[in-house]
Amino acid sequence: MELIREARPHGREKLRANLIEWFHWLLREAELYDVRYPVKGAYVWRPYGMRLRRHVEELIRRSHDETGHQEVLFPVFIPYEFFGKESQHIRGFEKEVFWVSKGGEEGERLVLRPTSETAIMPMVKLWVHDYKDLPLRLYQIVSVFRAETKMTHPMIRLREISMFKEAHTVHVDREDAERQVREAVEIYKKIFDEMCLAYMINKRPDWDKFAGAEYTIAFDTVLPDGRTLQIGTVHYLGTNFTRVFEVTYLAADGTRRLAHTTSYGISERSIAAMLITHGDDAGTVLPPRLAPIQVVIVPIFYGEEEAASVISYAREVEKALREAGMRVHIDDRPDKTPGWKFYFWELKGVPLRVEVGKRDLEKRQVVITRRDTLEKYAVGLGELVDAVRGLMRTVEENLRRRAWEELRSRIVRAETVEAAKAAIREGKVVEVPWSGDNDCGIKLKDLVGADALGVPLDSDASVGGFDLRDLACGEKRAEFWLRLSERY
């Protein structure tokens, strides 16, 4: 394999200047998603986008199946009788709920699920009898509905979240449930690593935790414009839901005890984060393991006399790659120029492009271009499969490395309100000294003019031996670093 062109990746100026406008352009031009459906916050997955989504769903399913989770499917309707039982939960979600206001002649009051804790617990009560039935780990990938009143954005802020993976687990005690929380964090790390996403892990402040949770752990990523996006959450629910639904089990000592539960979710926001994180002004770059098409072959010929032999050679190349288990497509459209095809497939994020022309046929070689760097390589047909496998690994490693470098460069610390404000204006995630007091935390985020992500769990959250004061409540000694950012 011979390098014949050095790296010259596309710029990111347009993406950084107006990320949402760029994202709309990408979804439209790359034929991933259509935003023109006439209901606010509800969008259409196009065939190419659906193929990408299916690969992500397969990753999510595999990651859960391998760790003892079982897939289920619950109805979209939740009786209000169930939904209204957990007081914190209904207070947190009531403003976002879609109500079924009429259904034939029946007057039953129903909710379109915003999340499924109140749907699943009544059934778990019927299934769990004694400690031998636990732990129980369930998950489903479904649509959930939120009556968003804020501005909606494709994949990012929706009224119908159509790829909501929610896991719900039931345990004998807090210790086992919190062990499950830690496992859920590891599952999510594996998923996001395969998506080549960099992430922060933050314990949400109490005022921003999931409604009905004891605590919430969130995965946040930083997008190229400096705003953060929540891409996954893990909740320890304690006995808040099992108490109101009377989910108990017979313990080994013969006593009946309340079960402890967790829940954790991922949605199509993770796909949005992947498309944007790996995007540039020419389109996006898809991680090879998730790309609908891993290799696109572009035959280059001039005139009818070259076409037959070059296309025949392209099909030979395709056969070799397909037999090696790769997802391959030949673009032999006669009405499009090679340059147009290069632009089109770069836009759609195909990781590798293989060019074959008359000279390549004569030399029994191909030219391979990496989408992430635009480096070109001449590769002999005999080493083609190994070269493509190696380049796909290299592309994946490079996407992951770039994402982590970008994220780490965004996180800074500030010990004054003015310094924190300046960092936010520069598109940074800023860590500021905080006492842990909720009122002080709310005041602090308002002083800085940012959102609170919470206390970092991926680094030392303690201020250590430094005598730092809470930036909002100077009379209180700081105990933690509190992460702040602008976020979607």
UniProtKB/Swiss-Prot annotation:
Its main location: cytoplasm. Consists of three domains: the N-terminal catalytic domain, the anticodon-binding domain and the C-terminal extension. SMART domains: ProRS-C_1. It is found in: Cytoplasm. It comes from Pyrobaculum arsenaticum (strain DSM 13514 / JCM 11321 / PZ6). Catalyzes the attachment of proline to tRNA(Pro) in a two-step reaction: proline is first activated by ATP to form Pro-AMP and then transferred to the acceptor end of tRNA(Pro). GO terms for biological process: prolyl-tRNA aminoacylation. GO terms for molecular function: ATP binding; proline-tRNA ligase activity. Keywords: Aminoacyl-tRNA synthetase, ATP-binding, Cytoplasm, Ligase, Nucleotide-binding, Protein biosynthesis. Homodimer. GO terms for cellular component: aminoacyl-tRNA synthetase multienzyme complex; cytoplasm. Pfam families: HGTP_anticodon, ProRS-C_1, tRNA-synt_2b. Its EC number is 6.1.1.15. This is Proline--tRNA ligase. It catalyses: tRNA(Pro) + L-proline + ATP = L-prolyl-tRNA(Pro) + AMP + diphosphate. PANTHER family: BIFUNCTIONAL GLUTAMATE_PROLINE--TRNA LIGASE, PROLYL-TRNA SYNTHETASE. It comes from the Archaea. Belongs to the class-II aminoacyl-tRNA synthetase family. ProS type 3 subfamily.
